Amino acid sequence: MTTQGVRIGIAGINGRVGRLLREEVTTGGGILSGGTARDAAPASDVFATLDALAPRCDVVIDFTHAATVRTHADILARAGVAWVLGTTGLSAADLEAVRTAAGRIPVVHAANYSPGVTLVTRLARQMAAALPSATYDAEILEMHHRQKVDAPSGTALAIGQAVADGRGIDLASHIEDGRTGHTGPRRADAIGFAVLRGGQIVGEHTVSFTSATEQIALTHRSFDRRIYATGAVRAALWLRGQASGLYDMEDVLGLD
């Protein structure tokens, strides 16, 4: 499958990740076809709406805001444009819109486009399957910069979902977070979350499995947001020629 000549658009091209994506598209072998921004200038390759950008693109990379997801899903599905979605903090209705779009176009949706995080998530699923909750307590700790607006992070929730999948349980009914006061003993089947915010930490995630006799922990630290842009461009190039459907970074990395 060739990746030459893939026209890539960037939703939110002037944002923190968008600016990195602009650089990575060119160095990664794609063709930058433009982007969207609220401060778009007339007669440029930056547009005020995704409707205007979509016809110029084979793929759109989207790290914007949860509030735009349902609108973007509809626009890209109607335009037949593939979608790399990295927005986190999505509601059930947002996720349903993503799944509906994936019935018409190829979509890669991931909370984190780092290859390292993808591997940590996969290993967490395997570890959870091998280490029973009756004896191994699963806990997830995440740290991010002070500007981050959602908690736990999308990546932490994705790791938690992997733990739940490995143990064959529902994540929503097994989350323990925000512990304070007299909480009583820890539930044996709980998946615990702890959140730290401060400074300019790009991202750090640790998943641990602790018994009475040992602890196994996996930690991933991001030093530069560029890793997310590099991974997202890799996903965009991979999408060329893919059938409609919902994919993740494990698919992009060929891990399944």
Curated annotation (Swiss-Prot):
It catalyses: (S)-2,3,4,5-tetrahydrodipicolinate + NAD(+) + H2O = (2S,4S)-4-hydroxy-2,3,4,5-tetrahydrodipicolinate + NADH + H(+); (S)-2,3,4,5-tetrahydrodipicolinate + NADP(+) + H2O = (2S,4S)-4-hydroxy-2,3,4,5-tetrahydrodipicolinate + NADPH + H(+). It is found in: Cytoplasm. One of its GO terms (cellular component) is cytoplasm. Belongs to the DapB family. Gene3D superfamilies: Dihydrodipicolinate Reductase, domain 2, NAD(P)-binding Rossmann-like Domain. Pathway: Amino-acid biosynthesis; L-lysine biosynthesis via DAP pathway; (S)-tetrahydrodipicolinate from L-aspartate: step 4/4. SUPFAM superfamilies: Glyceraldehyde-3-phosphate dehydrogenase-like, C-terminal domain (SSF55347), NAD(P)-binding Rossmann-fold domains (SSF51735). This is 4-hydroxy-tetrahydrodipicolinate reductase. Its EC number is 1.17.1.8. Keywords: Amino-acid biosynthesis, Cytoplasm, Diaminopimelate biosynthesis, Lysine biosynthesis, NAD, NADP, Oxidoreductase. It is an enzyme of class 1 (oxidoreductase). It comes from the Bacteria. GO terms for biological process: diaminopimelate biosynthetic process; lysine biosynthetic process via diaminopimelate. NAD(+) binds at residues 12-17, 39, 86-88, 110-113. (S)-2,3,4,5-tetrahydrodipicolinate binds at residues 145, 154-155. GO terms for molecular function: 4-hydroxy-tetrahydrodipicolinate reductase; NAD binding; NADP binding; oxidoreductase activity, acting on CH or CH2 groups, NAD or NADP as acceptor. It comes from Gluconacetobacter diazotrophicus (strain ATCC 49037 / DSM 5601 / CCUG 37298 / CIP 103539 / LMG 7603 / PAl5). The keyword NADP applies. Its main location: cytoplasm. CDD domains: DHDPR_N. Catalyzes the conversion of 4-hydroxy-tetrahydrodipicolinate (HTPA) to tetrahydrodipicolinate. The active site is at residues 144, 148.
